[in-house]
Amino acid sequence: MYAKLNEFEEKVIRGITEDRWLKLATELIKTGQPRACDPLDPDLPSGEEEAIAMLVAGKLEALGMEVNMYESQPHRPNIVGILKGSGSGPVLMMNDHMDTYPVVEPHKWDKTNFKPFKATRAGDLLYARGSSDTRGNLACTILAAQALVENGIKLKGDLMYCFCVDEERDGTHGSIYLTKEIGIKADYSITAEPTAYGGDATKGDWGMNLSIANGGHCLIEVTLEGDKAHIWRPDTSNNAIVELAKLISHLEIMPFTHEITEFMGHTPPCTTIVRIRGGLPGEMQFSPDSCTVTLAVVGIVPGMTLESIILDIENEVKSFIGERKDITYKVNQVKDCLL
């Protein structure tokens, strides 16, 4: 049972309509794209969120907010807007990010007529890159502030809007920069991120649950090295691709050393295979002597460290290799990828 809304709450809710949201979300989704696409892949260039940042900064200023921009990389400004409260109440932060996943295969975007940044409605769903993660959510947060202002409602404490860059790439130039270098802080924070586990995917509400904590992740590379041989003599080599393919089945189900924490979530510490590389251009006459798999280690909880994660993976690899002397291995964190 939901609590009865008071007069002020009813006024705010009435100001947040579907038509308003759809119009604003459609505008936000297309702005600055595809430049704002920000891949996690450390070997690809990061995005630039400048265009979308300037747009949302203008919208916050139009609501009477004091707006500041902070950037640690050119063309990547973080936006911080403050709607002053009426007294000395706690500061509430509304947090969201302005970068999105990249679009690698636009020919598969049939729901949007192969235009990934064109918001396209189908029934109760809105399709486009960023509609869920998180331009549609961004629209919700802005409309909430607009509804407050339109109805002359002031919170006791300041309402802070913090729109970050670089979220998809671990936040070095976004939330981490703002908190550690600029000193941004609040008493409470609501993050409009749609990836809360626990919804019912069959009903279309996956990612719609509330979460009160967030696990970590990191990228780890595992390389096996064997022997190179001519393709007509596979019996004389230890094909690194073949050996790594066998190892992957072990890495997929391996356990990680960790303690049960107060908030474990629905994803325990585990691995997801995200990339595999083997063989060199111009050497298809030979079996490859080296192959590398990239693992996303997800569900990291307090107490786990980079060292403990690498040690667990090394032990799994050692168990797989056993006493064999014809295969060697390396395990390391992907460069510039945070824990």
What are these regions (language model features)?
Residues 90-94, 162, 188-190, 272-274, ...:
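Hydrophobic/aromatic beta-strand patches that form the interior of the parallel beta-sheet core
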Residues 64-70, 118-119, 330-332:
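Short secondary-structure junctions
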Residues 1-19, 48-51, 62, 199-204, ...:
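Metal-dependent amide/peptide-bond hydrolase catalytic core
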Residues 34, 99, 168, 195, ...:
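Catalytic metal-binding/acid-base residues of hydrolase active sites
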